[in-house]
Regions:
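Phosphate-binding and adjacent anionic-ligand microenvironments
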Residues: 12-211
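Cysteine protease catalytic core and zymogen-processing segment of caspase-like enzymes
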Residues: 1-11
């Protein structure tokens, strides 16, 4: 909501950054306004690195950490809350209505995450299995794997048959990321429907546990 509003009404300069596990809708918003978007590892420290070396309008991560370079190279929840309140006042809409407008313009994007508290042995074995899945002749949750990205964890881009015939259908992806400090694996997914996301998260849970 903030990115779309700033680009549409403020025209502030700079690129945009986003973490590896955040929505691809941001890419579509940037494409509309001719802005470059940088995808980086998970953690706000990567946003800071960009802000200290390049002209960055804003950057963010999945946990809600959003920063504006013209303000300071750090997250500021108070600023973001004030900006959102201003957007709602100017547009005369609730936050839910603003999100619905984005879904209409850029396609429905549904997102989910689960945390698995599992031991290091199971966690590491699951990541190792994910890394060797082949592209083309492998499927996940009934969806062909079309691309794999290992920037931070293992991320599968999938050919979701549910997206066929849908205008601006969200790209379907699934990310498995093992914590380096805890016996924990986080699993993220985004797709064009809540049902697809739920199915992928359930399949990923079974995969991580050895199913």
């Amino acid at each position: 909501v903030l990115l779309s509003w700033v680009l549409k009404h403020k025209g502030w300069p700079g690129d945009v950054t986003r973490a590896f596990n955040t929505t691809k809708m941001l890419d579509r918003i940037c494409a509309k306004y001719g802005r470059k978007i940088h995808e980086h590892g998970i953690g706000f420290k990567y946003v800071v690195d960009y802000m200290l070396t390049q002209e960055i309008l804003m950057g963010g991560e999945e946990s809600g950490g959003i920063g504006f370079q013209r303000h300071l190279p750090e997250r500021d929840g108070m600023l973001n809350a004030l900006l959102l309140a201003n957007v709602m006042a100017e547009e005369g809409k609730t936050l839910g209505q603003l999100v619905a407008d984005l879904q209409t313009e850029y396609g429905e994007h549904q997102y989910g995450r689960i945390d698995l508290h599992i031991g290091d042995e199971i966690k590491n074995r699951a990541i190792a299995r994910a890394r060797v899945l082949e592209i083309g002749d492998k499927v996940f949750a009934g969806m062909p794997i079309v691309r794999v990205d290992m920037l931070d964890g293992v991320k599968f881009y999938l050919d979701n048959p549910e997206a066929e015939g849908r205008q601006n259908a969200a790209e379907t992806w699934l990310l498995l990321r093992a914590s380096g400090t805890e016996p924990l694996m986080r699993i993220y997914s985004e797709s064009c429907s809540k049902e697809s996301v739920a199915r992928l998260l359930q399949a990923a849970r079974a995969f991580a546990l050895g199913g």
